[in-house]
Amino acid sequence: MKKYSKKDRQMKLQVAIEENPFITDEQLAEKFGVIVQTIRLDRVALSIPELRERIKHVASVNYADAVKSLPIDEVIGEIIDIQLSKSAISIFDVRSEHVFKRNKIARGHHLFAQANSLATAVIPNELALTTQATVRFVRSVYEGERIIAKAKVRPATDNRAITIVDVKSYVGDEIVLKGKFEMYHATQK
């Protein structure tokens, strides 16, 4: 692995983050052959925010106007991609406040809230309400894990006021939650 001078590393770090704002400090450390603390110090010196803040910024710039059914700050997790009436993706980092203290397992309502708010966000109308949800928790999620929820809208059926959204949540490549959300929607007057 090539060793970079501090100045070169910081320039390349800035380019790497501009190209992929979702890259982690750990991935950057591996890429540049340094420890994570060095990457953090470089980010601070360059006034580059941590990953969580970069994700929030990208989401607020790209998706704040796209989501009509609820304010972007009411979405549980960070939306990283959305195509109204088609699909959406969000991420949720499980922290200490989301888990049971004794076993560090995430409380189920956080996983449900991420999936349900993503199903709501993908609806292109001002009013979107969950009429029915069928959810299956496949495996426990633990503190420190990152949940990636992916929503897909099914093609319209006869009842145009109801749309079915399927959500699958993953930790890595492993499914942790499967959900089917029936969403009532209308344009408010």
From Swiss-Prot:
Top-level taxon of origin: Bacteria
Example of a GO MF term: DNA-binding transcription factor activity
GO BP annotations listed: fatty acid biosynthetic process; negative regulation of DNA-templated transcription; negative regulation of fatty acid biosynthetic process
Alphabetic keyword roster: DNA-binding, Fatty acid biosynthesis, Fatty acid metabolism, Lipid biosynthesis, Lipid metabolism, Repressor, Transcription, Transcription regulation
Keyword Lipid biosynthesis: yes
GTP-binding listed as a keyword: no
Its biological purpose: Transcriptional factor involved in regulation of membrane lipid biosynthesis by repressing genes involved in fatty acid and phospholipid metabolism.
Similarity remark: Belongs to the FapR family.
Name by which UniProt lists this protein: Transcription factor FapR
Species the sequence originates in: Listeria innocua serovar 6a (strain ATCC BAA-680 / CLIP 11262)
Gene designation: fapR
